[in-house]
Structure formats: structure tokens, C-alpha cells
A protein has these predicted regions:
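Aromatic-acidic/polar surface patches that form glycan- and anion
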Residues: 10, 20-21, 77, 171-175, ...
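Flexible, glycine-rich phosphate/dinucleotide-binding loops
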Residues: 24, 47, 91, 134, ...
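Short, structurally constrained coil/turn elements
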Residues: 34, 78, 119, 187-189
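Membrane-proximal basic amphipathic "stem/tether" segments
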Residues: 1-16, 100-101, 107-108, 240-259
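The conserved 3'-phosphoadenosine-5'-phosphosulfate
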Residues: 45-52, 152-160, 166-168, 185-257
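PAPS-dependent sulfotransferase catalytic domain
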Residues: 84-187, 206-221
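PAPS-dependent sulfotransferase catalytic core
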Residues: 1-88, 230-236, 242
Length: 259
């Protein structure tokens, strides 16, 4: 009965971090998770990760996708009944289709926002992006070569990345395309997400994390502080050298005024 009273007093609240690669989403979600009050936001619905989470929780996303969705939301919450997850734009449409095809959260006539909120009660949207799109593209090109997408203290790249202007420009255009997917989605569903700028997150980590918590209406215990970042920035002398060289070799490919 105590569990029932707890759920009545603290109804489930959900949020999704909407992002694209190299936007700083790991820095953000690691910080939210470390508060122990904002769920455990991960890419639970990226198909290649679902098998792992399914095994962990004895869920079968292939046989019972509604059961998997509900099981994740029921188990990956913090004690205050907050559930968070992360979505990349490149599998957004696939995820929506899978939710709709189950007929458990809506049908062909159900709009996307209702579909999502049927699956995730009181869902709110957080969008993290980078203002400096060229540096984002540099980071993507580097990660594609090294395979290191998330860096923690003490970790090193296993192989030296090489400057590749074509790969950098392709990464820049792809980032623009993927950000466009999110902007079209927010416009379509009529939602204005809470915007987090990666550069501001790096400059004032604790204040930015707290601003997201305020948006989500999550309070921390009195006197609690947001800990230092778990994930570290990958920008270094290589990144600075690449940026200067790219701008020199392809001056028309990027305008700082727009990125």
C-alpha cells in the first residue's frame, strides 16, 4: 500500500533529451543522472541498445515492445518517479513508428505528441544543441576516426585522427540536416522545448544543470550541489589546428555568423 500512496503523491513525470551526435548530450545527461533526482536518462530506445537493456530487465522488445517501453519507464526512474531518456534525430521517426504500430499508445490517427505522452506521462522536451557548428563537425569527424564518442577522465584516443576536410564538411552538412529534423518535429507537434546550449553548459555547468531541473520542476535537497562533470570536453590543440586549417582551405563552407 505504501508504494501505491507514493505513486499517488508522486505521479510519474517524464522528459526526453532531444539531440544529435556531438551536441554535449552525454555531458548533460550524466549531470542530470548524478543528481539522483532526474531519472537515469540513456538511449533506451536505440534499437542496438534494446537487447542489452532487455536482458538486464528480463524484457523482450521484439516480442512485446509495449511491455519493453513500460518496463523501462517503470524501472529506470528515480525515487521521486522521474523518468528521462535520450533520443537522436536520426531514429526519431523509427521510434514513433514502432510506438504507433503496437496500437498500445495510439493508432494511425493519433498525433505524435499524444502518442508520446500516452507512452510517457507528462512528457517534457529538452533540446541540447551547439552554437558553434564547425566545432561540432570537427568533433564528429574526429570521433568517426577514433571510435571514441564519450571521454571520461583518464581515457585516451587509441589512434591518432587525421585532418580530412571532406569528412569535416560532410559532418557539418549532416549536423545541419539532423538539427532540421528536430526543428521540424517541434514545429509539427506545437512544442517549444527547453533549450540548452552546449557552450553555456561548459561555461557554467552547475547553473545550467539547475536550470534544466527547474524546467522539469525537480527540486534538490536543501544544500545539495551539482557535482563536477563526469564526461570531459574533447577539444584540444588538434581541434584548434583543424579549425584553422579548415577555415583556410574551405572559407566558403562555414560562416561563423550562422554557427
Amino acid at each position: 500500500m505504501g508504494g501505491l500512496f507514493h505513486k499517488l503523491r508522486h505521479p510519474r513525470r517524464c522528459y526526453v533529451v532531444c539531440t544529435i551526435p556531438r551536441s554535449g548530450s552525454n555531458l548533460l545527461t550524466d549531470g542530470l543522472r548524478a543528481t539522483h533526482r532526474a531519472g537515469m536518462p540513456k538511449q533506451f530506445f536505440l534499437p542496438k541498445f534494446e537487447t542489452r537493456y532487455g536482458v538486464e530487465l528480463a524484457l523482450d522488445p521484439l516480442a512485446d515492445y509495449p511491455g519493453y517501453v513500460r518496463g523501462i519507464a517503470n524501472t529506470k526512474t528515480t525515487g521521486n518517479e522521474v523518468f528521462g531518456f535520450k533520443l537522436m534525430s536520426w531514429y526519431l521517426d523509427t521510434f514513433l513508428t514502432r510506438l504507433r504500430d503496437t496500437c498500445a499508445f495510439g493508432d494511425a490517427a493519433t498525433d505524435d505528441l499524444s502518442l508520446l505522452r500516452n507512452a510517457f506521462p507528462r512528457l517534457r522536451f529538452v533540446h541540447i544543441h551547439r552554437r558553434h557548428k564547425l566545432r561540432q563537425a570537427l568533433s564528429t569527424a574526429r570521433a568517426l576516426q577514433t571510435g571514441l564518442w564519450k571521454v571520461k577522465n583518464g581515457e585516451m584516443e587509441e589512434r591518432e585522427p587525421q585532418f580530412d576536410a571532406e569528412l569535416i564538411e560532410q559532418s557539418l552538412r549532416e549536423a545541419e540536416r539532423q538539427e532540421g529534423i528536430w526543428q521540424n518535429f517541434f514545429q509539427r507537434i506545437g512544442v517549444r522545448p527547453f533549450e540548452v546550449e552546449y557552450e553555456k553548459l561548459c561555461h557554467d555547468y552547475e547553473e545550467t544543470i539547475r536550470s534544466v531541473l527547474d524546467f522539469l520542476r525537480i527540486s534538490l535537497p536543501r544544500g545539495a550541489r551539482v557535482g563536477p562533470p563526469v564526461t570531459i570536453r574533447q577539444s584540444d590543440e588538434i581541434s584548434r589546428t583543424w579549425e584553422e586549417r579548415f577555415l583556410a582551405e574551405r572559407p566558403s563552407a562555414y560562416s561563423p555568423a550562422t554557427g
